[in-house]
């Protein structure tokens, strides 16, 4: 799930933190990818007639199809991917996981009912909600990656946290995930939409944490407190606290401790904090996650030549893939992994730190942008109200 509405908060309040571009702009970069999130998206997206792809034996192949071709696309564009798999979830996450299982069970029942009485759209909608990544899916994907020569590592717990460690250490350029909580784990750069299909035509979003903090005017602790208040995987959200309210509360009070105190002392009792809401533990999980240091032997990785015959045996003979396409894909891997060895020119230069004067200028420009956006929003709202109040037939 990640952090609710965080991207909205960033795009509205720290727009300079987000760069949008094509996949080819990532040429020559090593990227740590949240494997479980990617596999889940493949199971949902790679479908035929509302159903997951299957071979003649009835085995699901959507995850393998997605992983094979999306990884090829990255390598074609000069990216060197490293996949990071989830380990055991933290205990604090068990409540959220239990809710997800319950929702999937409910969706499975609705899916069966929709097949009897609903439309095609209903069937597909409920079918997608039943999807979950199994241990077998993960093991098959690891086998495929090994045959492709693409490295992977297993995280002790949260994959996003391990990706962030590698990014901070400079072993990879960025962490890639759709989960915005990757920023809470202190990844300097987050890439979104990297594993999306080309057909979706979604730009790659590159989010820089230092610019997020600068744009919001927060340090990391305050930012993490904001994210917990917005709603994360570890805690139930506080009812009636939406994105704008969460941002205002954190800005007004400065920390979750003071926000909670203000809520409890509010004579109107506007907000009801859930009985079990251990926000300190949630914060600790973001600041001290169970991860391996970047120099740990299990965090060593390298890209190798693909095992062409192994790929044919696994995908063609075992899973019913087209042999021509698999061999063609293997040839692309062999060719493009060599191209990806080239370094980006930017790698030879260190960024120059901004002066206080430059920082003040950037902040002033950012505030002017926000003010202009607010003014336009008010003017648009006023124009809409006036348009509604005019009698019909008048210009």
From Swiss-Prot:
Stretches the record annotates as N-domain: 1-104
PTM note: Phosphorylated. Phosphorylation upon DNA damage induces relocalization to the nuclear plasma.
PROSITE patterns per record: XPG_1 (PS00841), XPG_2 (PS00842)
Biased composition (Basic and acidic residues): 356-389
Cell compartment(s), UniProt: Nucleus, Nucleolus; Nucleus, Nucleoplasm; Mitochondrion
UniProt keyword terms in alphabetical order: DNA damage, DNA repair, DNA replication, Endonuclease, Exonuclease, Hydrolase, Magnesium, Metal-binding, Mitochondrion, Nuclease, Nucleus, Phosphoprotein
Binding, DNA: 47, 70, 158, 231, 233
Chain positions covered by the region annotation I-domain: 122-253
Keyword presence, ATP-binding: no
Cofactor note: Binds 2 magnesium ions per subunit. They probably participate in the reaction catalyzed by the enzyme. May bind an additional third magnesium ion after substrate binding.
Disordered: region residues: 103-123, 356-395
Binding-site residues, Mg(2+) 2: 179, 181, 233
Pfam families hit by this protein: XPG_I, XPG_N
Region described as Interaction with PCNA: 341-349
Description of how the protein assembles with itself and partners: Interacts with PCNA. Three molecules of FEN1 bind to one PCNA trimer with each molecule binding to one PCNA monomer. PCNA stimulates the nuclease activity without altering cleavage specificity.
Similarity annotation: Belongs to the XPG/RAD2 endonuclease family. FEN1 subfamily.
Protein role: Structure-specific nuclease with 5'-flap endonuclease and 5'-3' exonuclease activities involved in DNA replication and repair. During DNA replication, cleaves the 5'-overhanging flap structure that is generated by displacement synthesis when DNA polymerase encounters the 5'-end of a downstream Okazaki fragment. It enters the flap from the 5'-end and then tracks to cleave the flap base, leaving a nick for ligation. Also involved in the long patch base excision repair (LP-BER) pathway, by cleaving within the apurinic/apyrimidinic (AP) site-terminated flap.
Protein name: Flap endonuclease 1
Gene assigned in the entry: FEN1
